[in-house]
Amino acid sequence: MALEALTDLKKVRNIGIMAHIDAGKTTTTERILFYTGINRKVGETHDGASTMDWMEQEKERGITITSAATTCFWKDNQINIIDTPGHVDFTIEVERSLRVLDGAVAVFDAKEGVEPQSEQVWRQATKYDVPRICFVNKMDKLGADFYYTVQTIVDRLGAKPLVMALPIGAEDDFDGIVDLLNMRAVTWRGKVEIGAEATYEEIPEDLKDKAEEYREKLVETVAESDEELMERYFAGEEITVDELKAQIRKLTISSEVYPVYCGSAYKNKGIQPMLDAVIDFLPNPMDVGSIKGHDAKDPEVEVLRKPSKDEPFSALAFKVAVHPFFGKLTYVRVYSGSVETGGQVMNSTKEKKERIGKLFQMHSNKEQPVDRASAGHIYAFIGLKDTTTGDTLCDAQDPVILESMDFPDPVIEVAIEPKTKSDQEKLGTAIQKLAEEDPTFTVKLDEETGQTVLGGMGELHLDVMVDRMKREFKVEANIGNPQVAYRETIRKPVEKLEYTHKKQTGGSGQFARVIIALEPYEPEEGSDQTYEFVNEVTGGRVPKEYIPSVDAGIQDAMQYGYLAGFPLVNIKATLLDGAYHEVDSSEMAFKLAGSQALKEAVAKAKPVLLEPLMAVEVITPEEYMGDVIGDINSRRGQVSSMDDRAGAKVVKAKVPLSEMFGYIGDLRSRTAGRANFSMIFDSYGEVPTNVASDIIAERTGGNA
């Protein structure tokens, strides 16, 4: 039977589950699916049987790599959930799922509190204005501390948590929660079978004072935000539960507060109240309102599309995956209008028409066919040939382009050499399909060695991609050691550089003259744009049809830097002037002139080498602190802070990625296996001269 999407959008929630790698996100999602009736048997992550983790590598590693989408129902409401990965190498999956969500559940480990990846994901959610509720998970774990975790939400995220539930007991004695809205205990005592109903009781005597204190804080916070409620609160009048709920909903949707719940997903405790909160407090598509885009023919004209089936169709493709039977699946969020199976849509990003073969709502990797895709929902489309992540699909009669996504450049690379000619052919297919799925997985040819070089966001990212090539595409290949993705940039402006491209042989010749200026370019915070081109030519001295060719030539030359052939970034190029010839000028001539002008200008602009710097966090017992800091310093790291956390010391530092290979082994041997660390890409920084000269010499065969 086809699963039809709810047409009343007020009863729809598009949410993500987001967290640090081991906070229990996937288990939480599995329990949601069980309690909402989708799963009859619950899969455990540590058994490799989890429904949402459907790739072989995910089942083996016990982590979520891709964002599986699924649909379920709770109390007459439809919840479309995306389970996102918690490992830093897969932040792109988080980023693109947040782009299409209306709300999220942030899951925290009750012992660890806010961890580095939690901070990263939280920042990404803030970037896309995604309202959140918090679920403090693993309350049954040794060392679980709800109040500590809530404090870390304040200290590390700078957020305003609104405590909605208090734990009853902790660790093995965790039995339930105090529901602060209704002032009652909600318990699941002893070993709770999956699917067991909660019991509602009086609040335990030893928790009554604390419950009163937190209830008072809750009411006060909510009342402060509304003049009428505040007057009634100070007059001693009672504010009803429904009034509190309505105001908490407003505050949550505007990201002024973040309601906090707690439980143990693994022990089946606390899931139902959290699901109620998803419905009560997270926005529906109507709350989010119109999506912004621009006219497909004129980027300056803003277009708004309401979440209504009566509007023209518009949707954003946010993920591409390969399904074992159907081939290419394109995950799509529909923002307005609707489209039927077999219908034709326009990919306005690529200006190509696409026909929809089949439409599904997904439950992890199991598909449920639907006849129509409607506004406010998430679907998988089959049959789209040219659509990739970030593309807009729309009505061909009313084209629009929705705001797309920026994807970061890779920070790590490996060379790959197929073992046989047959492997070479299979490798080409594998790379094309995997790059379609993941825009942060890149491929290039090293002109000097002739090797194929794969790029990604970290060692695990590339491990998984290479593993998939072997398993899914049967590619046998030798893999080189990981290499750092260095970049080059300039430090000094060049006010004017003239270059003339001139070639005269028999027949028509080639002629193009360009005068360019070059200067360092500072990208806006949060932007992945690393280049800007400005045209200041007047009076038609370079005809306008040749201007894009100059830009293209400059961008081509930026792929291969001056010092050691690494890509050039953070450059602003201005075309000041030029000249052309009626017969001999062409697009190609101006492209070559732009390319050569950039190379000559960079040589005069004090080029420098850049390297990826990682934000590293080490958690270590105090007695090893000196060793850990000494080791970080020896790796050219800069320690930024030292804090206490749960009886251990936390060292935060920025360290070049090139110095971090093999770090986990060194750290374990220095600390008798008692320390651990995490790292996230932070930024690119200039390589010190002595180190840079070695890198350049190695790259250029000693000609530094």
Swiss-Prot record:
Name of a matching Pfam family: GTP_EFTU_D2
Entry's transmembrane regions: none
Protein name: Elongation factor G
Assigned GO CC terms: cytoplasm
Annotated function: Catalyzes the GTP-dependent ribosomal translocation step during translation elongation. During this step, the ribosome changes from the pre-translocational (PRE) to the post-translocational (POST) state as the newly formed A-site-bound peptidyl-tRNA and P-site-bound deacylated tRNA move to the P and E sites, respectively. Catalyzes the coordinated movement of the two tRNA molecules, the mRNA and conformational changes in the ribosome.
Subcellular location: Cytoplasm
GO annotation, biological process: ribosome disassembly
Matching HAMAP family: EF_G_EF_2_B
GO molecular function: GTP binding; GTPase activity; translation elongation factor activity
Predominant location: cytoplasm
Record-listed GTP binding positions: 19-26, 83-87, 137-140
Keywords: Cytoplasm, Elongation factor, GTP-binding, Nucleotide-binding, Protein biosynthesis
Family listed: Belongs to the TRAFAC class translation factor GTPase superfamily. Classic translation factor GTPase family. EF-G/EF-2 subfamily.
Organism: Corynebacterium jeikeium (strain K411)
Gene encoding the protein: fusA
InterPro entries: EFG_II (IPR041095), EFG_III (IPR009022), EFG_III/V (IPR035647), EFG_IV (IPR047872), EFG_V (IPR035649), EFG_V-like (IPR000640), EFTu-like_2 (IPR004161), G_TR_CS (IPR031157)
Residues covered by the tr-type G domain: 10-286
